[in-house]
Amino acid sequence: MKNLRLGVTRAVEELQALLNEPVIEVTKESDVIDFHKSRIFLGTEAALHRIDWADLVLFADFDQELLARRYRCEEQAMAQLILAQRLVSSHKRVAGKVVVQSRQPNHPLFGLIAAGDIETWASVESKRRQLLEYPPYGHIALISGEGAEEFIKGLNGITNLQILGPNEGAWLIRASNPE
């Protein structure tokens, strides 16, 4: 069988073998990080919040964040890049680097962040959310779990409510006002 996704633990093993030095795994489950055991840390987004500085931050397959099925995916991806930039710039030494692996190197978000033009992104994103009636211009609720189907049935007949689904046992409810 072929590994389709490497995963953090397997990536740590591969990197240790390649570099012939210890690599520390950092995830939200990591208890204590011993910064004296290694100079290389590999992990999930949690690493951005658990490490104070870095010489290099690498995002492998950043498209998973940039193109995720969440209406806030670009905003969340941008936040990760900003956190990474803070890590490589926070030490009183030569600034480090943030490297992003993507199949979409010309995505507008990369250019705007590189130029430090967050205002343009915010303006475009605000117009997009207004057009699609996403928050804060509309309201969205994801209903799933035990009792979800009965709850959805109870919403039948309510005007100004759009119910999408079911999709894998979940419904998306959209409304232009909170009532």
Predicted features, each with a name:
Residues 1-150:
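Inter-lobe coupling/hinge segments of SF2-like helicase ATPases
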Residues 15, 167-170, 179:
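C-terminal active-site/capping subdomain that shapes the small-molecule cofactor and substrate pocket
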Residues 138-142, 170-177:
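Short, hydrophobic beta-strand segments
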Residues 146-150, 174-179:
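Helix N-cap motif at beta-to-alpha junctions
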Residues 160-167:
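Short beta-strand elements
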